[in-house]
Amino acid sequence: MSFEQKPKVTVILANLGTPDEATVPAVRRFLKQFLSDPRVIEIPKFIWWIILNLFVLPFRPKRVAHAYASVWSTDSPMREIVFEQTQRVQAYLERENKQFDLTVLPAMTYGNPGIDAVLEKLSAHPQEHVILLPLFPQYSATSTAPLYDAFAKWIPTQRNLPGLTIIKDYYQHPMFIQALAESVLAYQEQHGKPEKLLMSFHGIPQPYADKGDPYADRCRITAKLVAEALHLKDVEWAISFQSRFGKQEWVKPYTDQLLQDWAKQGVKSVQVLSPAFSADCLETLEELAIQNAELFQQAGGGSYAYIPALNSDQAHIDLLAGLVQANLDALTHTLAHR
């Protein structure tokens, strides 16, 4: 590379993933890839192979495909949002970084565009530096770590390796907390303030937390900081964890049980925020917004509303781009002094 050429830098925005279509075969392929990852399911491989192939994949894809169809438009909501986030972060960073030949790419851990395929593309175009931003605000071995694994698999295949930065998470970043709080206030300005604000996060099995996964603790910190930013009293909000899978104990309290308890206690209005999600997806649009609303109301509760994820809100784009920009500033300094 000549000295006149701008250093190539690629930024990867990576989310969990989504099926290619809202069909049973596509959902089955996606679930097989996702649920075959030992980071996600920590059960002895042979035992889990039997459970997955004989009891999960023959039955679960039909129900999940039906759920996807209820939220699908021209594409998966998550993929559409991640693509828009990528375009807007690229535009932001290009304005601020004329010194780099800079590209921002979307990637998914499972499904398309897959992280392995994205890394393979980089092999054909040597990079000065790669910055990975997992779109998981709270690190977990079940979500963020598989992206580390993808890089660990790719690195030994490369001769001219780039510099590499992985932004582990941002669960208590001031811009993140402010963006969440502002999204709640904006929603409540239009729809009113509820009796209870529930911050519901995707759950993980309790044994994972017992073994050192920091996810649940980081979720609790995020929730506490958002509540403080909103000046909420302890009785006005709570934290919970959704999407239990299997018979294992998961981190508590469980979202579905808490909503039923509130309904029985006479709570008449609830709004739900899910700060673990950077983009709305099946879990937020179908489970949180629809299933849990029915659960709460059937148990005797009244008004229930889901507050959308940050998605492509300007405050969210500013946060994501700002996280990357801090690393680009450090890279600029490094390149100027080497």
Curated annotation (Swiss-Prot):
GO cellular component: cytoplasm
Disulfide bonds: none
Catalytic activity: heme b + 2 H(+) = protoporphyrin IX + Fe(2+)
Pfam families reported in the protein's UniProt record: Ferrochelatase
GO molecular function: ferrochelatase activity; metal ion binding
Keyword tags: Cytoplasm, Heme biosynthesis, Iron, Lyase, Metal-binding, Porphyrin biosynthesis
EC number: 4.98.1.1
InterPro entries linked: Ferrochelatase (IPR001015), Ferrochelatase_AS (IPR019772), Ferrochelatase_C (IPR033644), Ferrochelatase_N (IPR033659)
HAMAP family to which the protein is assigned, alphabetical: Ferrochelatase (MF_00323)
Family, similarity comment: Belongs to the ferrochelatase family.
Name of the protein: Ferrochelatase
Species this chain originates from: Acinetobacter baumannii (strain ATCC 17978 / DSM 105126 / CIP 53.77 / LMG 1025 / NCDC KC755 / 5377)
Record gene name: hemH
